[in-house]
Every structure is written in C-alpha cells, then in structure tokens.
A protein has these predicted regions:
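NAD(P)H dinucleotide-binding glycine-rich loop of Rossmann-like/cofactor-binding domains
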Residues: 64-67, 72-78, 90, 99-163
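Short glycine/proline-centered loop/turn elements that form peptide/ligand docking sites
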Residues: 85-87, 183-194, 222-226, 245-247
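Mid-domain Rossmann-like dinucleotide-binding core that forms the NAD(H)/NADP(H) cofactor-binding site
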Residues: 133-205
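A short acidic, Gly/Pro-enriched loop at the edge of an enzyme's catalytic core
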Residues: 210-217
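C-terminal capping/lid region of NAD(P)-dependent oxidoreductase domains
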Residues: 286-290, 304-324
Length: 324
C-alpha cells in the first residue's frame, strides 16, 4: 500500500511516499480502506517535533528521539471496512466508517489502517460526505470539550473565540451559537465574513485588538491573546487550547488561589460518549467541520506546508487513491 512516511523530524519536505506492507487486522480489529484523512495541526507538530513552550522534550519522549517511532502519521480517517479480525461482530464488510486511530498508533495517512472495532470508530451518518467525515473529530471534539465540559458555557453568556476560523475555532463558533451564547470572533480581516456565517454575533480583526468588554468565557485556540484574564468578567473562564507548560501549571494552581476567574487547559476526552455528542450536534444541524484545502496523498508535502502556514482556514484533508 502507499503511505506518507516521516522518518525524521523536520520541515514538510521530510515526508515521503513509500510502499509499505498492508496491515492485517488482529483479533478484535477491522481493516479500513481509507478514502480521506485529516491532516491536523497536531500532525504538523509531530512531524516538526514542535510544541508549545516547555513541552518540546516531551514530544520526543512520547513519539521518538530523532523521528516518529510510528512513521505513518495521521489519526482522523474516513473509509470502508475491507477485512475483519477474529471476534468482530459490530461491523460488516463494506460498512462506511469514520473515526480516530487508537491511542498513539497513528497510521491514517496511508491507504489502509487497522483499528480496534470497539475503539473510536463509528458508522458514517447518512448525508455526511467523505471529506466532512475525515475532518470531523479533531476540531469538533476539542471545541466541545473546552466549551461544554471545561468552561461550562451557558446560554446567554458572552464568549470570545480567538482564532475563530481554524479547525477548532470554527467548530467552537458553531457549537456556541447552538448553545445560545453571544459569540464574538477574533479572526483575520479576510475571514471576518466567514466568521459571521459560522454563527458569530460579532467578528473583529485580531490585529486591531478590539475585543473589549468583559467576557464570561474566552476560548484562546492559539494561546496568544494578551491580558486574557483581565478581559474576563467575574467568574469568567479562560480555555487555553494551545497552552505552554507554564500556562498549564498555572491552570492547575490558579483554581486553588483564585475562585473568581479560572483557566482551563486540560487534555480533551476522546471517548465514545464525546463522539456521540458531536454526532448528535451534526444531526441537529449545529456543527459541520469547515473544509479548507484538499490534497491528494502524493501532494502531502504541500498539505503539511498549508498546515504550517499559520493562516489555515478550517480543516486540511488528504485524498487517497481510489479504493480497490
């Protein structure tokens, strides 16, 4: 099978297309012929061994010292079940599925991937197109976890989303709008109209630093908003999606020191329940993954460059060769 392989950390050009053995599904696993895969900011960070301040050593400890131990990156996928391991009854051959690879196994940037049948895999809902399915979970699960679980966003509260048209921010604007919050979006000038279409009540150019007033919740996706705590109303909550080690430690300490304003920077929950909630939001018309550029597997170096640009709108997806 063809796969995108990362054998050493570095710029997008370190990714090569190679022929690799097709995986065999073990007991309790299914083999997926991938039609499309998401290429997320997390994939780009792993490829470059790039992390928020203070976390760089941990990336190499977790994934490999000089290059990823599992050289085929990618976690989000959409495809079709083409083989069943022993003991699998939940799926049948030909089922159209989407999901997230198991734990740190990665492997979705390839024509085939084997995953646990009882893991983070679901049958694709009627009407959901393949690119949506491939880009469904990364931004959506992150946004829902921060807004609904960590920051406890309530109807009528004022929310500021920093980075409102990326994968996470675009999902957050939609989910918060559905939740009945008043949403202010910070984005580039070129993306203000898009932010409004996603459901924001106000859309402001982040370069002007015009987000004034007291917000009940701030979701800072890139972790760059100056004086964020000072912009919170009493009892306000700050969600830091991309947090430095110092910010994470602060989030752990501050609730004990200051019950008035809180910082949340916890790892999100990837559970069947979280997936089901996001699918329910999709079914209710409250969430659609924002699709950006789509690249063929052969163009994956360009896809990584797009993810690295810092100006990515929505989700980048990878198209696989036609399923045989």
């Amino acid at each position: 099978m063809k796969a995108a392989v990362c054998r050493r950390y570095g710029p997008p050009s370190v990714i090569t297309i190679e022929d690799r053995p097709e995986p065999l599904p073990g007991r309790g696993e299914v083999l997926i012929a991938i039609e499309s895969a998401g290429l997320t900011s997390a994939d780009a960070r792993i490829r470059a061994a790039r992390a928020p301040a203070g976390f760089a050593p941990f990336i190499r400890l977790a994934f490999g010292l000089t290059g990823p131990r599992r050289p085929v990156l990618g976690r989000e996928y959409a495809g079709r079940v083409v083989a069943l391991g022993d003991g699998v009854s939940r799926f049948r051959l030909g089922d159209e599925v989407f999901g997230i690879t198991d734990g740190m196994r990665l492997g979705a940037h390839a024509e085939r991937v084997a995953v646990r049948a009882d893991g983070l895999i679901r049958t694709r809902p009627d009407g959901m197109i393949v690119p949506e399915a491939a880009a469904f979970f990364f931004g959506g699960l992150t946004a829902a976890d921060f807004l609904l679980d960590q920051c406890k966003l309530q109807p009528g509260e004022r929310l500021l989303v920093v980075g409102a048209t990326g994968a996470v921010g675009s999902a957050a604007v939609q989910i918060a709008h559905h939740q009945g919050a008043h949403v202010t979006a910070l984005a580039s000038k070129a993306n203000l109209e898009l932010a409004r279409k996603l459901g924001s009540d106000e859309a402001l150019d982040y370069r002007l630093d015009a987000a004034i007033g007291a917000f009940d919740v701030i979701l800072d996706v890139p972790g760059v908003l100056p004086n964020a705590l000072a912009r919170l109303a009493p009892g306000g909550r700050l969600g830091l999606v991309t947090a430095s080690l110092g910010q994470l430690l602060g989030a752990m300490i501050r609730p004990r020191r200051d019950s008035d304003r809180r910082i949340s920077a916890n790892v999100i929950k990837e559970t069947p329940e979280a997936m089901a909630r996001l699918i329910a939001l999709y079914t209710a018309g409250a969430y659609r993954p924002l699709l950006a550029e789509s690249f063929s597997l052969a163009e994956i170096v360009r896809a990584h460059a797009a993810a690295d640009s810092g100006h990515k709108v929505g989700n980048v997806t990878i198209r696989m060769p036609k399923i045989q």
